[in-house]
Amino acid sequence: MSQEKYIMAIDQGTTSSRAIIFNKKGEKVSSSQKEFTQIFPQAGWVEHNANEIWNSVQSVIAGAFIESGVKPNQIEAIGITNQRETTVVWDKKTGLPIYNAIVWQSRQTAPLAEQLKSQGYVEKFHEKTGLIIDAYFSATKVRWILDHVEDAQERAEKGELLFGTIDTWLVWKLTDGAAHVTDYSNAARTMLYNIKELKWDDEILEILNIPKAILPEVRSNSEIYGKTAPFHFYGGEVPISGMAGDQQAALFGQLAFEPGMVKNTYGTGSFIIMNTGEEMQLSENNLLTTIGYGINGKVYYALEGSIFIAGSAIQWLRDGLRMVENSPESEKYARDSHNNDEVYVVPAFTGLGAPYWNQNARGSVFGLTRGTSKEDFIKATLQSIAYQVRDIIDTMQVDTQTAIQVLKVDGGAAMNNFLMQFQADILGIDIARAKNLETTALGAAFLAGLSVGYWKDLDELKLLNETGELFEPSMNESRKEQLYKGWKKAVKATQVFAEVDD
């Protein structure tokens, strides 16, 4: 028994780091989690201390071993999945970051994004990267760090600095600087990578004046990138052999291997990804085209809709408004609401994501009356998550001319049965909740295990997939459309308010 082999997944998220050990059946054997500091230097800015992230990862690796009794030599391979777009620039020699990591949610580079738009680059960037010019992606964050840290541009040009998203930073640290690599899915979120030609785009690098020397090598999602330095893994030299950005890892963990399959992860934000197969398909309607994953010499593309605020809207109810003591309580309050769903919350706390891409919009509430209760407000906040998902699913169906039959769901807020049922109702399709909600970490584990032969092939993985619960729509068509029409009106009003000048 003691020599059974396992896969470890490191899931480095926006608010915490986790290490999870999986067995051959894809079951969780143990996990350890550690939160780290969110830094808000100014309104709308979000930063992390990259060294604190690294320390938290070391801590959870130890925690997962302690909880399970598994020894480091029983780990066959390590998979990494990470918050995407978050940007670290560090000194090649000392390994010290030259500035905090700028987080995907941060809006501090919005003026740079606006400048690129006004210079007429929207179409060019979209065709090359599949992305919409926005502060969300790494490109403007790198430029900002090089602009705001003394001598950074000069040092970058001399090859003294390295850039990476969090996956790159962790592999660099775990291998003690032996590997400076990223994978297709993370590279595709930098706004510097040509997803058609599968290479860093020289023209974009020139436009942004970002030296190529700082960029990591781009590799597939399932191969050996390097081995852990023994002193970082309790004496073990274990291959790091799977890597994907969190949302693409969840797509893989949900086993959405066929074109047309769609998953939604309800995390801090909510991210809907559709596998579109080996053909790159540019959205006509403000969705992102990205790389789902690259494996066995093939690259599979995806369409993605990003919602910035989902689970964090529930955190806001808890921490900001103190309406609930914990997240699960929101379900109970929502069920106790007896109003007619006339209240709409638009949680545009950091702007609106897909398909609106309005970075100036801010949160708003509509339809309040003297009779509105706390329960109504909480229910409207949960419903706002489902409405935003409908915006994206509708857009995907238009873009791909495909009728989506089922939405595979995972992530923390997917545990909320009220939200899942309302999601099924407002979409009019089945919601299949994964039995194992750890699909992000599981996806990273699958990618790592495949490349070292722990699992043989995709067919073997398909046997491990189970739906935990199916939510079927039960709302009539006219009611569904009436509610959604109210939502569209609320979003429109939110955007009008964002335009008003003093």
Curated annotation (Swiss-Prot):
Glycerol binds at residues 84-85, 136, 246-247. It is an enzyme of class 2 (transferase). The phosphoenolpyruvate-dependent sugar phosphotransferase system (PTS), including enzyme I, and histidine-containing protein (HPr) are required for the phosphorylation, which leads to the activation of the enzyme. GO terms for cellular component: cytosol. Sn-glycerol 3-phosphate binds at residues 14, 84-85, 136, 246. It catalyses: glycerol + ATP = sn-glycerol 3-phosphate + ADP + H(+). Its EC number is 2.7.1.30. It holds the Pfam family FGGY_C. Keywords: ATP-binding, Glycerol metabolism, Kinase, Nucleotide-binding, Phosphoprotein, Transferase. It comes from the Bacteria. Pathway: Polyol metabolism; glycerol degradation via glycerol kinase pathway; sn-glycerol 3-phosphate from glycerol: step 1/1. ATP binds at residues 14-16, 268, 311, 315, 412. The modification Phosphohistidine is found at residue 232. Activated by phosphorylation and inhibited by fructose 1,6-bisphosphate (FBP). GO terms for molecular function: ATP binding; glycerol kinase activity. One of its GO terms (biological process) is glycerol metabolic process. CDD domains: FGGY_EcGK_like (cd07786). InterPro entries: ATPase_NBD (IPR043129), Carb_kinase_FGGY (IPR000577), Carb_kinase_FGGY_CS (IPR018483), FGGY_C (IPR018485), FGGY_N (IPR018484), Glycerol_kin (IPR005999). Gene3D superfamilies: 3.30.420.40. ADP binds at residues 14, 18, 268, 311, 412, 416. Homotetramer and homodimer (in equilibrium). PANTHER family: GLYCEROL KINASE, SUGAR KINASE. Key enzyme in the regulation of glycerol uptake and metabolism. Catalyzes the phosphorylation of glycerol to yield sn-glycerol 3-phosphate. Belongs to the FGGY kinase family. This is Glycerol kinase. The lineage of its organism: Bacteria, Bacillati, Bacillota, Bacilli, Lactobacillales. The gene is glpK.
